[in-house]
Each structure stands twice: as C-alpha cells, then as structure tokens.
C-alpha cells in the first residue's frame, strides 16, 4: 500500500529479513516485543529477490502487541481472513500481466516516496514516467488505465508528457488534512474546481464523505443524504468524480466512522451503506468507487442496471 508498510502487509517481521527493516522489531530480556508502535519496514530496505520471499497478508498491525504473533494478528473482528492465505507478492509489472489475463481495467496509484527524491538518481518525474513505461512495455491500451496520485504535479506530468495516459488521470484529493481547507467552503479551495479543469485534470477523487452532506430535516420521500457543495461544484466545473473507500469502515451502528463523517448524524445501521452508495451513484454521479470488497457494489450495480 506504500513504500514503507511491509511490516503491516507482509510477514516480514516473522522472518530473518526483519533485521533489515528501517526500524526492526526489538525485544526485552524476557523475549517480549517492546516497540510494536514504531516498527517500520520499507521496500527500499531489501532487494527484489528478498521481497519475493515474503508472503502478503491483509493490512494491519497491533501496535500494542508484545509478541510477533500478536503483532500480525491485527485484523478487525468485522473483517475476515477467510481469503487471507498469505498470498504471493508481485512486482508492478507482474501485476499488469495478471490483470491482462483477467481482462480488467487497471488503476495504479503512484505512491508518495518515503525517501528523499531524487533517490539513486531517480527524480519524481522519472518515477512517474517509469510507471507509465511498464504499461507501454506490456502493450496495455491507455484507455484501460486510470493512473492516480495524491500529488497534483504527478497528474500534471502525465497530462503533459505521455498525454494518452493523462486523458483519464486521477487526482486523489487529500486536502482535508490541511488546516485552512474546508470541503464545504469553496473559498478555501486552492486550486478551485475551475482551476483544476484549466489544468486539464479530468478526474477528481476525494474520500466519499467529501461528496456527501447530511439532510437531517428530510421530509418523507426525501433522502437523509445529499450531494455536498464540493460534489456540486466539481460536477458543474466538468470534472468526473471517483470516491474512496466503500466498506473500509466498521459497522455503521458505531458512530464516528471516518469515511462517513459528513453524514454520521443521519446514519445508524449497515443498510445505510446502500443509501450512501445510491446517492453517490445517482445524485452525485460518480464514475467509479473504490471498495475493499466488491460484493455490495456489484450487487447494487446488477440490481440498478439490470438489462432485460
């Protein structure tokens, strides 16, 4: 999921490669793990050959664990490890071949480097280009690829340089983390929706809560969830929208789920997932939705778009 998350996405901490980690596991004289909250293992810590010896797992780490076993056993109870059989890790190029064989489209994210760039002579632009080059080498049509990045400069690079891949490049919007940004106040948006369009950015992708607003006074026949000002302004400017991440949250009977933060006051059960999805699809008009699990979104699409 990022350059430095191998400790949470693989079994590296249970192997001899753990000692090569940027922050390896540490133990006291009794053999107890003492730094679970600080362990960090990066792809740049090991060679490709060493990387291939690891096994993948669902992302998660118990940062209060006192043993490696406990550290790895971090899947929330409302998720499942049923399909988590310690999968084979792949390079990006290998994943492209798998996706080609499966006949699916591809939406790679250029992850933010965890090292200072340039790194070993590779600039940020080189990094952005290398990802494109691997699709070209595999003869993947640009129309099958939605390249994405939280770094607007990456998106602008793809628009300007290999433009065929820039035609459906995705700007992942994480400006919610900025102190002076309010998704409900257009005066705080920089760049504005119109400025993004002027840059030829085709697709904007925020977390789904930024596209939604609560409507607590909804009358009979009206929805408790409605499109946000952010969503309305983006659509009015001509931007396509993709949202993330459906079913990442826990049960909606629990208050305070991050991906539903803008509608938390008007939802209270898991059925409201379908209401959220319906508003995103029909009222906001998203063109895509990231989900940790495909079943619910597929069920909705099959139901709403059934062809007789």
Explain the meaning of each model-derived region:
Residues 1-308:
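Phosphate-group recognition and catalysis centered on beta-loop-alpha active-site segments
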């Amino acid at each position: 999921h990022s350059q430095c998350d191998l400790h949470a996405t693989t079994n590296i901490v249970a192997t001899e490669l753990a000692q090569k980690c940027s922050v390896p596991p540490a133990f006291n004289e009794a053999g107890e793990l003492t730094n679970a909250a600080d362990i960090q293992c990066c792809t740049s810590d090991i060679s490709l050959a060493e990387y291939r010896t690891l096994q993948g797992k669902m992302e998660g780490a118990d940062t209060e664990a006192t043993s490696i076993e406990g550290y790895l056993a971090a899947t929330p109870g409302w998720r499942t490890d049923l399909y988590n059989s310690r999968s084979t890790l792949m390079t990006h190029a290998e994943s492209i071949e798998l996706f080609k064989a499966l006949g699916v489209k591809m939406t790679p994210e250029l992850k933010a480097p965890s090292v200072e760039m340039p790194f070993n002579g590779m600039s940020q632009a080189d990094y952005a280009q290398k990802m494109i080059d691997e699709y070209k080498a595999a003869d993947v049509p640009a129309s099958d690829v939605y390249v994405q990045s939280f770094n607007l400069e990456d998106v602008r690079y793809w628009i300007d340089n290999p433009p065929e891949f820039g035609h459906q490049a995705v700007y992942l919007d994480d400006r919610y983390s900025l102190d002076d940004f309010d998704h409900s106040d257009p005066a705080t948006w920089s760049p504005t929706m119109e400025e993004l369009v002027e840059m030829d950015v085709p697709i904007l992708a925020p977390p789904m809560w930024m596209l939604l607003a609560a409507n607590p006074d909804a009358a009979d026949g009206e929805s408790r969830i409605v499109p946000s000002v952010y969503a309305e302004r983006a659509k009015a400017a001509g931007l396509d929208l993709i949202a993330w991440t459906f079913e990442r949250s826990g049960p909606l009977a629990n208050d305070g789920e991050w991906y539903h933060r803008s509608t938390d006051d008007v939802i209270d059960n898991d059925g409201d997932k379908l209401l959220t999805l319906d508003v995103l699809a029909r009222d906001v008009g998203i063109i895509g939705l990231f989900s940790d699990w495909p079943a619910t979104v597929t069920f909705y699409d099959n139901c709403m778009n059934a062809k007789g």
